[in-house]
């Protein structure tokens, strides 16, 4: 099997050296070249024709985002962004994902060498995922048209969504058309701390419904979406007649915290047939067992189809496990989940 050919673009010589060490330590990949800036990278891409590009977000001579935008227009290829953990870094990274980057890794704030080498397996996994990702599914999506407001539903109704690689854009596409009369949505997207708040704030500006990073103990309200905070699990719990959110630091599940399975299992238990479960693009099997539990508890469950997924991992696992009622294209997810949640009952509250 041929090796995954990687090109790293970073203005830091140390980072280029570390990335080279990491990539070359894996037998299935090789660093074919490195570049200190996008202008040099342009020539190296033509020369070496890499399978995956790792790209520093903030660089001199040409901004990483400007370069990414041009690259995706002229020569689309899988890109993994390398980002700082700052507020600005998370904003820029989210924009990069919108422009077509497959995924990102964060630079440790202290001890770059030790920190990056500790990320060795994660970086390799993200490069492997990027090499297999569907670029056709990751073309920048146009804003979906707003769905008509349906009847107000019982506050017992809610939607649970899980996603990973490619999920930030898929979630935007699902939430943007939702009317204010939508039920509450609980969302687990695999993301590090610091990024989930920026992600929620970004969606809040784009959507009619309110979108926020979830807080422990807060009441779950219709017309709002709650994003699990990075590195913490989110569960649905009850307080009397009301739903509320439970945030905790339990151990990683399926190597993830937050974990989609943790959310889905809690929704199966607390909401049962009053819920709809949705599993979107992502690598691995997180969410498959939880989605089966939701289906067995009477919930309607949807999986994104392969053609519209950046990575058809999590949906495939959920389908194979028997947890999925219906497989739909990303463009139909919003409409279908609202139709299914409304089919049960329409109670004015």
From Swiss-Prot:
Q: Name one Pfam family in it.
A: Response_reg
Q: Where is the active site?
A: 164, 190, 286
Return the EC number: 3.1.1.61, 3.5.1.44
GO cellular component terms, A-Z: cytosol; plasma membrane
- Effect of disrupting the coding gene: Mutants are defective in chemotaxis. They exhibit very high tumbling rates.
Q: Which SUPFAM superfamilies match?
A: CheY-like, Methylesterase CheB, C-terminal domain
Q: Its Gene Ontology molecular function terms? A: deaminase binding; phosphorelay response regulator activity; protein-glutamate methylesterase activity; protein-glutamine glutaminase activity
Residues covered by the CheB-type methylesterase domain: 152-344
Q: Give residue numbers for the modification (4-aspartylphosphate).
A: 56
Q: How is it modified after translation?
A: Phosphorylated by CheA. Phosphorylation of the N-terminal regulatory domain activates the methylesterase activity.
Localisation per UniProt entry: Cytoplasm
- Subunit record text: Interacts with CheA. Binds to a C-terminal pentapeptide sequence carried by certain receptors.
The UniProt similarity line reads: Belongs to the CheB family.
Per its database record, what is this protein's job?
Answer: Involved in chemotaxis. Part of a chemotaxis signal transduction system that modulates chemotaxis in response to various stimuli. Catalyzes the demethylation of specific methylglutamate residues introduced into the chemoreceptors (methyl-accepting chemotaxis proteins or MCP) by CheR. Also mediates the irreversible deamidation of specific glutamine residues to glutamic acid. Catalyzes its own deactivation by removing the activating phosphoryl group.
What protein name is recorded for this chain? Protein-glutamate methylesterase/protein-glutamine glutaminase
Q: What is the lineage of its organism?
A: Bacteria, Pseudomonadati, Pseudomonadota, Gammaproteobacteria, Enterobacterales
């Amino acid at each position: 099997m041929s090796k995954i050919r990687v090109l790293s673009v970073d203005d830091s010589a140390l980072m280029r050296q570390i990335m080279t060490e990491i990539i070359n330590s894996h037998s299935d990949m090789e660093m074919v070249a490195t570049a200190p800036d996008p202008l040099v990278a342009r020539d190296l891409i033509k020369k070496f024709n890499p399978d995956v590009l790792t790209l520093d977000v903030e660089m001199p001579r040409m901004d990483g985002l400007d370069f990414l935008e041009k690259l995706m227009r002229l020569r689309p290829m899988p890109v993994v962004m390398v980002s700082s953990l700052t507020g600005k870094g998370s904003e820029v990274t989210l924009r990069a994902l919108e422009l077509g980057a497959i995924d990102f890794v964060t630079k440790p704030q202290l001890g770059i060498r030790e920190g990056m080498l500790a990320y060795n397996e994660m970086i390799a996994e993200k490069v492997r995922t990027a090499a297999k990702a569907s670029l056709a599914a990751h073309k920048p999506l146009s804003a979906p048209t707003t769905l008509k407001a349906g009847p107000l539903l019982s506050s017992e109704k809610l939607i649970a969504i899980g996603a990973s690689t490619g999920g930030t854009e898929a979630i935007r596409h699902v939430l943007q058309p939702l009317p204010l009369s939508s039920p509450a949505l609980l969302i687990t997207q695999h993301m590090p701390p610091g990024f989930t708040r920026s992600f929620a704030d970004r969606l809040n500006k784009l959507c009619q419904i309110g979108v926020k990073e979830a807080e422990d103990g807060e009441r779950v309200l219709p017309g709002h979406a709650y994003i699990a905070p990075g590195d913490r699990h989110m569960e649905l719990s009850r307080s009397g007649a009301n739903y509320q959110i439970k945030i905790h630091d339990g151990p990683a599940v399926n190597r993830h915290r937050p974990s989609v399975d943790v959310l889905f299992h809690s929704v199966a238990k607390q909401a049962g047939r009053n819920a709809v479960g949705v599993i979107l693009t992502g690598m691995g099997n997180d969410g498959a067992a939880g989605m089966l539990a939701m289906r067995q508890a009477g919930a309607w469950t949807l999986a994104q189809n392969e053609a519209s997924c950046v990575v058809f991992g999590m949906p495939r696992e959920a389908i194979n496990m028997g947890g999925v009622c219906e497989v739909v294209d990303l463009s139909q997810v919003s409409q279908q989940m609202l139709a299914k949640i409304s089919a049960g009952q329409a109670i004015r509250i």
